Amino acid sequence: MQFDSLPLPPSSSHDTTSVPPLKRHAACDECRKRKLKCSGEATGCSRCLKQSLPCHYSLQKPMGRPPKKRPREDNDASVYEITDNGMWADIDDGGILTEEAGAEATAASDALRLCPPVYTAPMRMPQAFPNLLSTDDSHNHLWQLESGRSLDPIPATTGPWPDFSSVTAATSSPFTLPSSLTLIDSPSVSSPSSDGGNSSQCTCLSYLYLCLSHLSSLAPFPISQHTLCSLFIAAKTARAVIRCEVCPTSFALGMQNVMFTGTLLNVIADAWLRVSQADAEELGKLAAPPAYVASVTQNSPNPAEAWKDWLRQTVRSAITGGPADPAGQVKCSDSPTLLSLIEEMEARQHRWHRTRTVESPNEPGSCSPVSHEDHREEDMLCFRVIRSARDVIAKFEFAPHEYPEGVVPV
């Protein structure tokens, strides 16, 4: 390893070698922080420009080991006032100290090298797939699942979902699927065999896991039209998984279906709550149809209030199915409402318990057929998970008239 020699004072230095220019990182700070591929334009990378994020290329730190036991010129207290970006800079740039102060500063600098301070910062979720946030042209807004059809194996797509056709693409996700879940073989409803079993695997768990992973990867980014489209697609995925006919044939599959679907419904509810608190005008100009944007800009006496009303209608339509102006509907908004998914899952759990199709031990509080008279069905784990999603809907504070006719307000 090569070490740089200590710099000499300008008056006594005879080295005529020019100082090498400072180099900047090839990727911007935002892409490096999320571990994404950066396009590297000096004026701003494509991802930062698309997400309206500050694009800054920080300087590379000098390579090599810092010089040891370099005397300092400042007082003792400044030894401990070191920032995380320049931990060794103060030590390198110091001058000559007195003998006593130099010994104390040297001891402190050695202690910092042996036990450097730990700096905490909010954890950012790394973006596993660079094409999750694509433009409107590449979004597959017409993606939908037929009501009577089971989930097929995940195909390659150019839509808002990444390519999960290969194992390497799926394993680059920021989460690691527990080994206990990957070892469970679940049959499919497509082609039952002669012995009563099914030949292929059920893909519900894969869809749920990838859907949750995708939604979590959007959390660090500002709310945009891509967020709304992802939430609508997630609702379609939840509906297809709720209607799966394979999961109730096994207790393990049924429990995974209940827990992951309940988690997905809670994540969708929390995400819509975050959308409702976003800047209505900024989001509306990104997500609403161009004709509606022009109409609000030109004809509305108070555009700010008009955009707030549009955002309220959009969120209400996605949560409860309440009335909304068709002219301002977002693309791919033809998805089931969150409240309808909760009600459908509750009805499914009642049906599972009543028909006793899930084979499970009769444990109190488990998602199993009601076998003990002293345990209420509402206290079972599956209903408690669903109830937590209802609690999030209550935070929207929708008035009774904002619910469709025949829907019980939350």
From Swiss-Prot:
User: Is Nucleotide-binding among the key words of this record?
Assistant: no
Q: Which residues bind DNA?
A: 28-55
Alphabetically list the UniProt keywords: DNA-binding, Nucleus, Transcription, Transcription regulation, Virulence, Zinc
| Source domain of life | Eukaryota
A GO cellular component term found in this entry reads: nucleus
Biased composition annotated in UniProt, kind: Polar residues: 358-369
Phenotypic effect of disruption:
Leads to high sensitivity to allyl alcohol, a compound indicative for potential defects in carbon catabolite repression (CCR), but does not affect growth in non-stress conditions, nor in the presence of 2-deoxyglucose (2DG), an additional indicator for defects in CCR. Also leads to sensitivity to acrolein, menadione and t-butyl hydroperoxide. Abolishes the production of gliotoxin (GT) and accumulates bisdethiobis(methylthio)-gliotoxin (BmGT). Leads to reduced expression of gliZ, gliT, gliF and gtmA in GT-inducing conditions.
The molecular function terms in GO held by this entry are: DNA binding; DNA-binding transcription factor activity, RNA polymerase II-specific; zinc ion binding
Which InterPro entries would you find in this protein's record? Answer: Stress_Response_Reg, Zn2-C6_fun-type_DNA-bd_sf, Zn2Cys6_DnaBD
Please classify the protein's predominant subcellular localization into one broad category: nucleus
GO:BP terms for this protein? positive regulation of transcription by RNA polymerase II
Q: Which residues form a coiled coil?
A: none
Q: Where is this region: Disordered?
A: 1-24, 353-372
The subcellular localization recorded is: Nucleus
Output the PANTHER family linked to this UniProt entry: THIAMINE REPRESSIBLE GENES REGULATORY PROTEIN THI5 (PTHR47540), TRANSCRIPTION FACTOR RGLT (PTHR47540:SF4)
Q: What is the purpose of this protein?
A: Transcription factor that is involved in protection against oxidative stress. Binds to promoter regions of the gliotoxin (GT) biosynthetic genes gliZ, gliF, gliT, gliM, gliA and gtmA. Two related but different DNA motifs (5'-TCGG-3' and 5'-CGGNCGG-3') are specifically enriched among rglT binding sites in GT-inducing conditions. Also indirectly regulates the expression of gliP, gliG, gliH and gliN. Plays a key role in resistance against exogenously-added GT and GT biosynthesis, mainly through the direct regulation of gliT.
Q: What is this protein called?
A: Transcription factor rglT
Q: Which organism is it from?
A: Aspergillus fumigatus (strain ATCC MYA-4609 / CBS 101355 / FGSC A1100 / Af293)
Gene that encodes it: rglT
